[in-house]
Amino acid sequence: MGQKVHPNGIRLGITKPWISTWYADKSDYANNLNSDWEVRQYLTEKLKAASVSKIVIERPAKSIRVTIHTARPGIVIGKKGEDVEVLRAYVSKITGTTAQINIAEIRKPELDAKLVADSIAQQLERRVMFRRAMKRAVQNAMRIGAQGIKVQVSGRLGGAEIARAEWYREGRVPLHTLRADIDYSTAESHTQYGVIGIKVWIFKGEVLDGLVPAIEEPKQQPKRKPRGK
């Protein structure tokens, strides 16, 4: 049975950047990795209502810089920057170094796979029909400018006794093309019937780095001479 490779993992270092960018000696590597995990767990839990897509961590010169990509920067910053200062102090406490927190606003949340998956999960928890939630997400993404989107939900859909998976796709979603800019994410929806898993693939176009795609002209077939001449 054919399985699909993780769309982000196969493109890592080609068209997808790492979400942690730092170098450490062998003695410090495990501590840095563990503190990265703790920072992400804390921020994800603390900023549940802030529509956080991803958290990028950098470690320049014995300090840590955390960039929070969110669709609702006002919730992260808080009144007069009080909330972000609390986050900065706690991140500094976890890592034991000076911390800096930057906030990047996501202008088009309909084209962010993580935010789309979280939105569908929240709708399912509010007992919205899963087909309606899927179709709404697909229509919004295509309307904003996606070249293709695929949404899959799996579990006890509609409270059915037997779990199953259903998916809906519109446009192109080329999984094997490495230059394709595909945003992929997952989410879980905890309903009264059990956990429903959500997967979202969004195709935003091809990453060509300024190259113009070559368009091959169809070759003209040589004319055949009629027989008998």
UniProtKB/Swiss-Prot annotation:
It holds the Pfam family Ribosomal_S3_C. Belongs to the universal ribosomal protein uS3 family. The lineage of its organism: Bacteria, Pseudomonadati, Pseudomonadota, Gammaproteobacteria, Alteromonadales. The keyword Nucleus does not apply. It comes from Shewanella frigidimarina (strain NCIMB 400). This is Small ribosomal subunit protein uS3. One of its GO terms (cellular component) is cytosolic small ribosomal subunit. Keywords: Ribonucleoprotein, Ribosomal protein, RNA-binding, rRNA-binding. InterPro entries: KH_dom, KH_dom-like_a/b, KH_dom_type_2, KH_sf_prok-type, Ribosomal_S3_C_sf, Ribosomal_uS3_bac-typ, Ribosomal_uS3_C, Ribosomal_uS3_CS. Binds the lower part of the 30S subunit head. Binds mRNA in the 70S ribosome, positioning it for translation. GO terms for molecular function: mRNA binding; rRNA binding; structural constituent of ribosome. Residues 39-107 form the KH type-2 domain.
